[in-house]
Design a protein with these regions (language model features):
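Basic, short loop/linker segments at the boundary and entry of helix-turn-helix/winged-helix-like folds
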Residues: 22-72
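Double-stranded DNA-binding cores of transcription factors and transposases
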Residues: 3-15, 61-70
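Phosphate/oxyanion-binding active-site loops and adjacent basic polyanion-contact surfaces
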Residues: 63, 81-82, 222, 250-259
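Active-site-proximal, Lys/Arg-enriched surface segment
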Residues: 135-235
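An internal, acidic/charged active-site-proximal segment
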Residues: 247-358
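Short, positively charged, Gly/Tyr-enriched micro-motifs
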Residues: 59-154, 235-236
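Short, conserved catalytic/metal-binding motifs centered on acidic residues
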Residues: 70, 85-86, 134, 138, ...
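Gly-rich Lys/Arg/Thr-decorated short loops/hinges at beta-loop-alpha junctions or inter-strand turns
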Residues: 239-245
Length: 358
C-alpha cells in the first residue's frame, strides 16, 4: 500500500510560486466538492436533471449526467474555459465522489505527481485517459445546446426539482433583479448590445451628453447582456437561490421579461411558493402588478426613494392630516347573564297577564 504524507509549509509554497513552479492554482475545497457530488449523486438529483435536459445529441458517447456534473464542477472552481477541465478534475472532488467507475487518482512512483486514470465510456480510447471525457467534447456539447431550451429547462424542470427537494421555504420571499454582464468587445457575441456606461456602471444616453463630458473619461462603452433573475431568499441562512433567469440583449427592457419569468415559474411550481416579491422601481407597472396579485396572490413590494413622485405624494398627504396621540380604547365589560326566574314567579306573571287581558 502506497501512503503519501503532506506537510504544511507556507514558506516553501510561496517560494515555488515566486519561481513560477506551478501548473494551476485553485481555491475550491476538494472535500466540500466531493460531499456535494455524493449528495446529488446518491439522491438521484444529477440523473433527474440529465433526464430532462434538452440534449443536442441523439446518441451520447458520454452520459448526460457526466457532462452536467463536469459543468457544475467547473462552475464551483470558477473556471470558464473548457481547456481548464483537466486541472479542475485533478484538484477537485468529483472523482472522489463517483469512485473507480469514473476514474482513480494515484501518486506517480517516480516523481510523486498526482496522476489520473479514467476508463472512458465509449471504448474508443487508444491511450490512457486523464479526464472522464475530452474537454473539447464538453465545449461542443454545450455550444450546440439551444440556449432558449436550456433557459426554459432551468426555469421549469429545475424549478420543479427544487420544489420536490423542499428548497423553497415557507416564508416565500423572492427578489426580482436585473444586472448587466460585460463581455469582450466582439460582435460574434450573439444578440449582445454595445452601450455607454458611467463610472458607476449605469447606462447613459450618449445623445444627452456633450462632447466635453464624453472626453472626461467617466464614460466607457461596453458590450453587454442583461441578466434578469428571480432570487429566493433565505434570511436565516444569509444566502439566496437563483430560482429562474432570463438572458437578454443589453438594450432590452427587463420589465416584461421578468413578469413573464414569474408567470412561468408559478405555472411550474404552483401557487403558494411565491408569497412576496421585492422589486425596484425599474419593475414598476400597475397593470402587471395587479395581474400578479389577482392571478397568483403574490404581494409586490417596491421600496420608495426620496426622488420618486410617490414619495412626494405620501409626504404631501401627511402634511394635510392632523395627528393626535393614540389612545387604546377601553374594553367593554361583558354583560352578566341574569339568573333564571323561579317557576313560581313565572306562573304568577303568566296568571297576571291572563287577568289583564280579560
Amino acid at each position: 500500500m502506497h501512503i503519501s504524507v503532506y506537510e504544511r509549509d507556507r514558506g516553501f509554497v510561496i517560494e515555488k510560486l515566486l519561481q513560477g513552479e506551478f501548473d494551476y492554482v485553485d481555491t475550491a475545497d476538494e472535500v466540500f466538492e466531493a460531499d456535494f457530488f455524493r449528495y446529488i449523486g446518491a439522491g438521484g438529483i444529477l440523473k433527474k436533471l440529465a433526464e430532462s435536459y434538452p440534449s443536442p445529441r441523439k446518441k451520447h458517447d458520454v452520459p448526460v449526467w457526466l457532462a452536467l456534473g463536469s459543468s457544475i464542477s467547473m462552475r464551483l472552481h470558477g473556471a470558464e474555459a473548457f481547456n481548464k477541465y483537466e486541472y479542475v478534475i485533478r484538484c477537485g472532488g468529483m472523482m472522489n465522489a463517483f469512485g473507480p467507475d469514473l476514474g482513480s487518482k494515484f501518486a506517480d512512483d517516480d516523481n510523486g505527481d498526482i496522476k489520473i486514470a479514467c476508463n472512458g465510456f465509449n471504448n474508443k480510447n487508444a491511450y490512457n485517459r486523464e479526464t472522464p471525457c475530452h474537454p473539447d467534447y464538453l465545449r461542443k456539447y454545450f455550444r450546440d445546446t439551444d440556449a432558449g431550451r436550456a433557459e426554459k429547462w432551468y426555469n421549469t424542470e429545475v424549478a420543479k426539482l427544487f420544489k420536490k427537494r423542499r428548497a423553497y421555504n415557507k416564508q416565500g420571499l423572492f427578489i426580482g433583479d436585473a444586472t448587466y454582464i460585460f463581455v469582450p468587445d466582439n460582435p460574434k457575441y450573439e444578440c449582445s448590445s454595445k452601450l455607454l456606461f458611467d463610472e458607476h456602471n449605469h447606462p447613459v444616453d450618449p445623445n444627452k451628453l456633450t462632447k466635453k463630458e464624453l472626453k472626461t473619461g467617466k464614460y466607457q462603452w461596453h458590450r453587454c447582456y442583461k441578466l434578469v433573475t428571480l432570487l429566493h431568499i433565505y434570511p436565516e441562512l444569509d444566502c439566496f437561490l437563483i430560482a429562474g433567469f432570463r438572458l437578454l440583449p443589453g438594450k432590452a427592457s427587463e420589465l416584461p421579461a421578468f413578469y413573464e419569468l414569474l408567470d412561468s415559474f408559478v405555472d411550474a411550481v404552483g401557487k403558494g411558493v411565491v408569497k412576496r416579491v421585492i422589486l425596484d422601481r425599474g419593475f414598476l407597472d400597475g397593470q402587471r402588478i395587479g395581474h400578479v396579485k389577482k392571478t397568483h396572490g403574490i404581494d409586490v413590494l417596491i421600496p420608495v426613494r426620496k426622488n420618486m413622485d410617490i414619495y412626494k405624494d405620501a409626504i404631501g398627504l401627511v402634511d394635510e392630516v392632523e395627528f393626535c396621540d393614540y389612545v387604546e380604547p377601553s374594553k367593554a365589560k361583558p354583560n352578566k347573564k341574569t339568573k333564571a326566574k323561579p317557576k313560581t314567579i313565572k306562573k304568577r306573571e303568566a296568571k297576571r297577564r291572563r287577568t289583564n287581558n280579560k
